[in-house]
Design a protein with these regions (language model features):
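N-terminal alpha-helical membrane-insertion module
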Residues: 2-5, 18, 22-114
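A short glycine-rich, His/Asp/Glu-containing loop-to-beta-strand
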Residues: 176-195, 208
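Conserved metal-binding segment of the jelly-roll/cupin
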Residues: 233-247
């Protein structure tokens, strides 16, 4: 005999919460799938455009096309995260200029010492270290007045660049110690991020120099720079040196500004004069390329008078 059904006694305790959780999970899953599908569709569209162009390249200029493909693959495989996003970003996204410059960058690699990607200052020759420490000591000693001048001249904006020297060309001249030519350091600036401002993953164009960042006001928060598998929180280590042609991003998830010393130093090499000369030759082209890379940045001026060095 069948047992008689028990009369309905209402929902079980927690049943509503279970249904809510299931609904949230399903909604979140659909949202994630939608985002993934959108990204995949975007990548597929890029490949659909690239494949015919690649076919034309192999048909009309096969040797040159092969050289660029091989050099690009050698170059991109230096990165840690070898996934679809890496290859799509390098060949079809903001890494396109890095790919086009890959034959030149690989030639530069042959003229320089081994490049570990992420560097420690101790890995540089002693005269390089002395120059870096000289510049950083000036920033540490004059941090408050430099930040005050930046804040006075950078009212509204997502990201700003306060430049003393840009690939050897002098800009802001109110710090007398920076009004000279350095042997190895070719760019001296301060990078400023407004609150909760971050970059996307991106590649830099040239490997003639390395990027040195130093956080002037490290805060214990989600403020970091990430290059491949290396994630550097500024409160743990205020200095980060890396090859910016590798995939990287900078994140400021803090309700305040982030101020980082921003320097480019020529690659350590048995031929430092040659590397410096090559950088001087391409500096005009580099400036034009960088104007595209830094289109979301505001170049910050200064209202402070020029500081004349006293003797």
């Amino acid at each position: 005999m069948r047992r008689p059904k028990k009369p309905y006694q209402g929902a079980r305790p927690g049943g509503g919460r279970c249904r809510d959780w299931a609904h949230s999970f399903a909604t979140g899953s659909r949202s994630a799938r939608g985002k993934m599908t959108k990204t995949l569709r975007k990548s597929l569209r890029k490949f659909a455009i690239a494949i015919p162009l690649l076919a034309l390249g192999f048909y009309f200029i096969p040797i040159l096309t092969t050289i660029f493909i091989v050099c690009g693959l050698i170059d991109v495989l230096r990165n840690d995260r070898k996934d679809l996003a890496l290859f799509s970003g390098y060949f079809l996204g903001n890494g396109l200029f890095t790919w086009l410059l890959s034959p030149f960058n690989l030639l530069v690699d042959l003229l320089c010492y081994r490049n570990p990607g992420v560097w420690k200052l101790e890995q540089f020759p002693e005269d390089y270290q002395r120059e870096v420490n000289e510049v950083l000591d000036i920033f540490r000693a004059r941090k408050d007045e430099i930040i005050a001048d930046i804040d006075a001249n950078f009212g509204v904006g997502r990201r700003g660049m306060y430049v003393y020297q840009w690939y050897g060309k002098h800009r802001i001249d109110n710090v007398a110690e920076f009004n000279k030519d350095f042997k190895y350091i070719k760019t001296i600036a301060v990078s400023v991020f407004s609150k909760r401002e971050s970059t996307s993953w991106h590649f830099g164009p040239l490997r003639l120099s390395l990027r040195i960042l130093y956080n002037l006001v490290p805060v214990k928060a989600e403020i970091f720079v990430e290059c491949g598998n290396v994630k550097n929180y500024w409160y743990d280590n205020p200095q980060f040196i890396f090859d910016d042609t590798l995939l990287h991003r900078s994140v400021n998830e803090y309700d305040g500004r982030r101020y980082c010393v921003f320097m480019d130093i020529i690659r350590p090499s048995p031929f430092p004069r040659l590397i410096a000369g090559m950088l001087a030759i391409v500096s005009v082209s580099v400036e034009r390329i960088n104007s595209m890379f830094y289109k979301n940045w505001k170049m910050i001026g200064s209202t402070k008078p020029k500081k004349v060095e006293t003797t």
